[in-house]
Amino acid sequence: MKKATVGAAVIGAATVCAVAALIVNHRMRKSSKWARAMAILREFEEKCGTPDAKLKQVADAMTVEMHAGLASEGGSKLKMLITYVDNLPTGDEAGVFYALDLGGTNFRVLRVQLGGKDGGIVHQEFAEASIPPNLMVGTSEALFDYIAAELAKFVNEEGEKFQQPPGKQRELGFTFSFPVMQTSINSGTIMRWTKGFSIDDAVGQDVVGELAKAMKRKGVDMRVSALVNDTVGTLAGGKYTHNDVAVAVILGTGTNAAYVERVQAIPKWHGPVPKSGEMVINMEWGNFRSSHLPLTQYDHALDTNSLNPGDQIFEKMTSGMYLGEILRRVLLRVAEEAGIFGDEVPPKLKSPFVLRTPDMSAMHHDASSDLRVVGDKLKDILEISNTSLKTRRLVIELCNIVATRGARLAAAGVLGILKKMGRDTPRQGGLEKTVVAMDGGLYEHYTEYRMCLENTLKELLGDELATSIVFEHSNDGSGIGAALLAASNSMYLEDKS
């Protein structure tokens, strides 16, 4: 009996030891996995590092590329496109002007009434329409006839107060957000289509000419006074309300910048010197690339798998289209190598672009004690349930690394423009105020990103100079800005003067 009791005790003790060993082993494996997750995070953080010295190198490289792009066509990764906009709004414009904004599968028609000096925008209204899929791959005539018909409907429904005097044409600013080789303020050749459009017979044609023919067919008596892209429109919209605006930056799905340059500093410009002596340059800065950019393995993989490998590198590090995707790629590696989401890698995490930047922003801004928003997003988007608080904190840290790098690089880009304009150092006679007009959903809605960008530029400029550089949100440049450029380039300006 005693032997049996002793034997049972020995077996019981052995079982307890075995269970304890399993628990210890499990904890060790869990600890090892977490250590691996943290190692991946710290490595990523280091590779994404943007100390001030590096950002100043990026800014210097941006300035060098700007000079090269202004010197000759194809001389730089930056196209530095001449926009033929040499006459920006002053705030004195008066009258009713229109805008057509074609940037994707939807287009808008706007009417803006300007009140003249100190009058501002008295009235504005718009109509929006979707482009049927068959017209996106049809003929030029079919597409522009459809647009002109909607424009005619918009004009026909307006009240008597917007009627033009006899013999006077309505004037339109046309925002066309596809690749165009601009040949004047109101003409430009379509180079190619993007965003799901493929209309072969329009390529090589003057986009304003195609619209003008369609308007004539539909009985719309309207003249296109300005052909612009959304960044130039943002600059114009900002200039209308703040005379010190000299730079515009869009940070949304994509990114771009435009600024006011002295014509004498544009060697590739062979036309007459405009009265203003200035010209707006569309940088197409999303295509900027430099050895100083802190690229990681995730950036290289994203670029390789993209539709345009080797192009738009700056955009792929800073804009809303890509930030969420970079985060997804890092989370995928953490899941594969550290198993923080379980033994199996969540299938959804393997889907490119499933994690959008607005969702990343929502997680980054989660201030709840249990980080509930992070948990909900992981569950709803990636189908990852029951995440620990520690895991959610890791996700927020990764969000912060991705957003901080993007925002600080965007700030370095702005510094590069200011350096090219000679506004990065105090001038004789005191500081010159420079307003940077900003637009785009990323800038507007991703608060952490916006604050980081603005604070970084202040750091780079120093306390004294930072007071002279101001960011202003210029909303809807692609619409209102185009109407304002129609006003500032009106054929009737000389009559008024």
From Swiss-Prot:
GO terms for biological process: glucose 6-phosphate metabolic process; glucose metabolic process; glycolytic process; intracellular glucose homeostasis. It is a single-pass membrane protein. Pathway: Carbohydrate metabolism; hexose metabolism; Carbohydrate degradation; glycolysis; D-glyceraldehyde 3-phosphate and glycerone phosphate from D-glucose: step 1/4. ADP binds at G104, T105, N106, T253, G441. Residues 90-228 are annotated as: Hexokinase small subdomain. Residues 229-476 are annotated as: Hexokinase large subdomain. Its EC number is 2.7.1.1. D-glucose binds at T194, K195, N229, D230, N256, E284, E315. It catalyses: a D-hexose + ATP = a D-hexose 6-phosphate + ADP + H(+); D-fructose + ATP = D-fructose 6-phosphate + ADP + H(+); D-glucose + ATP = D-glucose 6-phosphate + ADP + H(+). CDD domains: ASKHA_NBD_HK_plant. Keywords: ATP-binding, Chloroplast, Glycolysis, Kinase, Membrane, Nucleotide-binding, Plastid, Plastid outer membrane, Transferase, Transmembrane, Transmembrane helix. The keyword Repressor does not apply. It comes from the Eukaryota. The keyword Plastid applies. The chain crosses the membrane at residues 4-24. It is found in: Plastid, Chloroplast outer membrane. GO terms for molecular function: ATP binding; D-glucose binding; fructokinase activity; glucokinase activity. Disulfide bonds: none annotated. GO terms for cellular component: chloroplast outer membrane; cytosol; mitochondrion. Residues 35-487 form the Hexokinase domain. Fructose and glucose phosphorylating enzyme. Belongs to the hexokinase family. This is Hexokinase-1. It comes from Nicotiana tabacum (Common tobacco). The lineage of its organism: Eukaryota, Viridiplantae, Streptophyta, Embryophyta, Tracheophyta.
